[in-house]
């Protein structure tokens, strides 16, 4: 039987906590997956210094290639920055990608000076505050306070993320795989315009935009995470079944 696997991609300054509930929805169905740390993550904020979007894409692409040695088709699941990378991979590997789940993808930013950041980043060094309340912006604030995301990061790394959003947006019309776009109206990091831009510009005929109202940016762990994960699981199982049925008929 033809096999399908999933590549799970975390966000900017993020940790495995942000996406580690996804595998629990895959393993009962014997779905192989990869969940790599992208360059500069999972260690110290300073390790993002000098890292650019080219590194994040290269790491995700390496994991994609590794997974492809095990499976016939890949479903990409990405949160925030990981959503950008997932869309980029879908545009680059159209014949190998079965579907895309784009969760709160960082195609736009609430930060009103994001477009000016590239001018001041070299002078700013690290952004953020080690003492900031990590529960701010979460519906489930206690879970947010226990989250392991970086509290600060090198300003140039954010500038690279901002530039990456522009790069990926140009690639959206090349995406042909079915896509599920998930976003929260309460996201204080990425505005709803990001999800709307992806939905409007993506080349996929089979596309769905799913909204939530009791989640912050970290949708795979916040207040509505069970429902978000249900949607992810349903998308994966539906498209796996359809693919296996079509290949069986052949």
Provide a role label for each language-model segment.
Residues 13-24:
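The serine-hydrolase catalytic nucleophile loop
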Residues 196, 200-218:
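Catalytic histidine neighborhood in serine/cysteine hydrolases
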Residues 213-250:
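Catalytic active-site module of serine/aspartate enzymes centered on a nucleophile-bearing elbow/loop
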Residues 28-45:
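Conserved alpha/beta-hydrolase
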Residues 78-82, 86:
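Gly/Ala-rich beta-loop-alpha elbow adjacent to hydrolase catalytic centers
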């Amino acid at each position: 039987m033809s096999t399908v696997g999933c590549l799970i991609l975390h966000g900017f300054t993020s940790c495995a906590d942000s996406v580690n509930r996804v595998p629990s929805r895959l393993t009962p169905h014997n779905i192989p997956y990869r969940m790599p740390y992208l360059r500069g993550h999972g260690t110290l904020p300073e390790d993002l210094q000098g890292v650019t979007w080219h590194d994040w894409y290269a790491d995700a692409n390496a994991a994609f290639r590794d997974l492809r040695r095990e499976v016939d088709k890949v479903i990409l699941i990405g949160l925030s920055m990981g959503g950008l990378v997932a869309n980029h991979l879908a545009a680059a590997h159209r014949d190998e990608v079965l579907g895309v789940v784009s969760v709160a993808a960082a195609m736009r930013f609430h930060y009103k000076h994001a477009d000016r950041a590239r001018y001041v980043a070299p002078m700013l060094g690290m952004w953020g505050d080690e003492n900031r309340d990590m529960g701010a912006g979460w519906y489930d604030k206690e879970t947010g306070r226990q989250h392991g995301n970086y509290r600060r990061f090198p300003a140039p790394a954010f500038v690279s993320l901002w530039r990456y959003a522009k790069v990926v947006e140009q690639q959206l019309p090349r995406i042909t795989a079915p896509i599920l776009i998930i976003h929260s109206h309460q996201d204080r990091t990425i505005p709803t315009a990001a999800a709307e831009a992806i939905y409007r510009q993506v080349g996929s005929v089979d596309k769905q935009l799913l909204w939530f109202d009791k989640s912050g940016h970290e949708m795979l762990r916040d207040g509505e995470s069970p429902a978000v994960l249900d949607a992810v699981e349903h998308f994966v199982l539906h498209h796996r079944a359809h693919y296996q049925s079509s290949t069986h008929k052949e």
